[in-house]
A protein has these predicted regions:
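Low-complexity, Gly/Ser/Thr/Pro-rich intrinsically disordered linker/tail segments
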Residues: 357-384
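A structural signal for short, hydrophobic/glycine-enriched beta-strand patches
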Residues: 42-107, 113-148, 152-158, 173-359
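C-terminal segment of classical bacterial N-terminal signal peptides
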Residues: 32-40
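Positively charged n-region of N-terminal signal peptides that target proteins for export
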Residues: 17-21
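Hydrophobic helical h-region of N-terminal Sec-dependent signal peptides
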Residues: 23-31
Length: 384
């Protein structure tokens, strides 16, 4: 992704902060409006939670909420990133601001449960699972039969090894929607199997018969549009697999633009220069995340009715990539496809033998996204 001129970022940020100051003053006034509850409130009929007040003297409540969400979206899509071998991530401080803005909007619109779900997922992104669980539980108290909320809570209690709580949510989910409960258990089983499988740096010496494919995940390009050493390492691994499997298709997925280049195109050009026939290569130049890598690659696998696929990525990333590709293929096909993975050792494989909590969190988070649960549901802040 192209870097933005610091002066432009500062000007845009100052504009956002000026708007936020005005909104904050209005919001403070709105939230300070008295809410009177009589002593016999429990005997009174059910009433709306929305405050009865004329907002014309301020800004309309709708305008306040719209501005809060617009600011959250601007911060969410900020180009500022931190990169590691496994992935490129949004700034944690930005996600905290996103959470704050969503919760301010929820104070004004207590029927917008989507705001709590979006805020909870922002906390998952930052690794604050306990805080996220609290927000999901708050949302569930307003919508106790919501199958997405039950799915989130079952997942994150499983991640926290809170077995009794996880089983409670799974049991209720099974009563309300047996199909969703079965799918969620399949996700858990897939994650458990993939993380328990030892990482390997080489493919099979005697490939199985049938339609085969290699799926190589891209990595963020350098600011000048050149390929990072990590991506070159993944390509070396891909080339070795391609030579050992001369009939295999090669899917190269990565579409984050940098200096008018994309990962998919540069990867394809590199392999062709190294002697791989371009007719074997499928460029996927649109995915901007590992979730999209899996979804878009799954369509290519389905179109060519691939029976065996080998995913290539960094050792610190490959388990997440394989899990997501398997889940994507549940929905797009091909039915019955078998998927394994080969790692480029961005770190010594011995150091990665046991999955870390941060890696496992990313696997669970993106597994739910790939399955179809949207993390951010509060327009204009919409993202799978």
């Amino acid at each position: 992704m192209a870097l933005e001129w610091p002066g432009a970022i500062n000007l845009r940020w100052n504009a956002i902060m000026m708007k936020r100051t005005a909104i904050a003053l209005t919001l403070a006034g709105l939230l300070a409006l008295p809410v009177c509850v009589s002593s016999d409130a429990w005997a009174a009929p059910v009433r709306s939670l929305q405050k009865e007040q004329n907002y014309d003297q301020y800004i309309s409540k709708r305008q306040v909420v719209d501005q809060l969400l617009a600011d959250a979206w601007q911060i969410f899509k900020s180009p500022a990133r931190i990169s590691t071998a496994g992935f490129t991530a949004k700034m944690p401080s930005n996600m905290e601001q996103v959470t704050e803005l969503l919760l301010q909007a929820y104070q004004l619109e207590p029927y917008r449960t989507d705001l709590l779900i979006s805020a909870a997922n922002a906390q998952i992104y930052n690794g604050n699972v306990d805080k996220a669980i609290g927000l999901f539980e708050q949302a569930l108290s307003t919508a106790p039969d919501d199958i997405d909320l039950l799915s989130y809570l079952a997942t994150w209690q499983t991640f926290k090894h809170n077995e009794a709580a996880a089983k409670g949510y799974q049991s209720k989910l099974a009563t309300l929607n047996p199909g969703r409960a079965a799918d969620l258990q399949r996700i858990f089983d897939t994650v458990e199997r993939v993380v328990a499988t030892p990482l390997k740096e080489q493919g099979e010496r005697s490939p199985k018969p049938g339609n085969r494919a290699i799926v190589t995940l891209g990595y963020a390009l350098n600011p000048d549009g050149s390929m990072h050493d990590i991506l070159l390492g993944r390509l070396e691994t891909t080339r070795a697999l391609a030579k050992a499997n001369p009939a295999a298709l090669i899917i190269l997925t990565g579409g984050v633009p940098q200096h008018r280049q994309t990962e998919g195109k540069l990867m394809a050009d590199w392999l062709v220069k190294k002697g791989i026939d371009r007719s074997r290569i499928i460029e996927e130049n649109y995915a901007t995340s590992t979730v999209e890598n899996a979804l878009y690659s799954g369509y290519a696998l389905a179109r060519h009715q691939i029976e065996y696929a080998t995913l290539v990525s960094s050792a610190s990333h490959v388990r997440r990539g394989q899990t997501l590709l398997e889940i994507a293929c549940w929905q797009s096909g091909p039915a019955g496809i078998r998927i394994d993975s080969v790692s480029y050792p961005d770190k010594p494989v011995s150091e990665l033998a046991k999955v870390s909590d941060s890696e496992l969190l990313g696997i669970y988070r993106d597994a739910l996204r790939t399955y179809g649960l949207w993390s951010y549901r509060s327009a204009p802040l919409l993202e799978r």
